[in-house]
């Protein structure tokens, strides 16, 4: 289930030394809480942890991070957004086009996130958060709960 996994990841992050650099707000919609994902929990955890780590480490000063999950039909949308500096334009360009120039910052962690989500039949999108900051949206297919049949 998605809800317990996301709550555990948020709690573990808040217990880590990186938590001193940010505040994490967790919001899981009731229909998303019990959504069942056909996913490797360790890999999905790595993707979310990478994004939380980026929010804490790639921003000056304290940053507010919002981790949320919403179910829409047969998909679960997990959003990690912050109010920090946001992704540099070169990073967004490299992620959207696959073309990394010599001045492109290191983006291996974001590529790992993309690969993990794609391997689970989903999509990962990275953008600037309005009015400021970075936003990653992970969309994953939800499997039907056999107990609900």
Task: Label each PLM-derived region with a short phrase.
Residues 54-56:
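Short helix-loop "hinge" at the ATP-lid/N-box region of the Bergerat-fold HATPase_c
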Residues 64-74:
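Short beta-strand/loop element within the Bergerat-fold HATPase_c
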